[in-house]
């Protein structure tokens, strides 16, 4: 199973003044973050503005990230959309680009029930049997929570490997860390609660500030893992 550990930047997508993706700058950002000590990357997430990109731009971003990173870090790509069919198309496109670990949020706008959300994730797993899923709970953006009913449904599925928890509800994160510690890797998605997440069992931080405070974030994690909490 892929291990999510340490600082995983939620990669920004750099644009030039004309609104085109600046792939050279993307490569420079990745190299800078690797030198600072990050352990992997998450392209095409919320911070990467996947919703503002064409499919061709998404494919090129995936290719650029994979080419630059190589075997120097874990890669988890966002693959999201407003309905199950669209997400499956994004999943297959992402898989074809060489990614096997995908960050998948609930479909936005449709507001599925928890049972429908279980069906959504199961359809994705069935359509792409060679990928792993990182659940993405960000209800302020999707208006749908990846609830405990969903976590219960997939807790024994070895291909649903983790959850990025971005609700901002620390008590929920603590409950996930306690109740599902043997089922899911917990990744912090609430940047202002990173230390709390690590103290309560998170193994990684999918981190927006790593795009602008890279060394500080990596130093924070290094001090935490060495026991220096001062």
What kind of feature is each model-predicted range?
Residues 125-127, 141-230:
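Catalytic alpha/beta core domains of metabolic enzymes, predominantly
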Residues 2-145:
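Active-site beta->alpha loop and helix N-cap motifs at the rims of alpha/beta catalytic domains
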């Amino acid at each position: 199973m892929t291990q999510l550990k340490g600082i995983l930047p939620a990669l920004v997508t750099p644009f030039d003044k004309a609104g085109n993706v600046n792939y050279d700058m993307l490569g420079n950002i990745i190299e800078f973050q690797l030198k600072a000590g990050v352990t992997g990357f998450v392209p095409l997430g919320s911070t990467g503005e996947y919703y503002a990109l064409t499919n061709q731009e998404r494919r090129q971003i995936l290719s650029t990230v994979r080419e630059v990173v190589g075997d120097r870090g874990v890669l988890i790509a966002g693959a999201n959309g407003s309905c199950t069919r669209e997400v499956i198309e994004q999943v297959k496109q992402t898989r074809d680009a060489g990614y096997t670990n995908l960050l998948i949020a609930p479909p936005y706008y449709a507001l599925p029930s928890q049972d429908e959300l279980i069906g959504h994730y199961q359809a994705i797993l069935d359509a792409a049997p060679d990928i792993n899923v990182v659940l993405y709970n960000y209800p302020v953006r999707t208006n749908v929570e990846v609830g405990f009913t969903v976590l219960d449904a997939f807790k024994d599925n070895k291909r649903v490997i983790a959850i990025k928890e971005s609700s901002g509800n620390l008590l929920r994160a603590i409950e996930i860390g306690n109740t599902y510690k043997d089922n899911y890797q917990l990744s912090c998605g609430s940047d202002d609660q990173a230390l709390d997440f690590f103290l309560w069992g998170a193994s990684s931080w999918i981190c927006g500030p790593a795009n602008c405070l890279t060394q500080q974030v990596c130093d924070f994690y290094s001090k935490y893992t060495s026991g220096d909490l001062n």
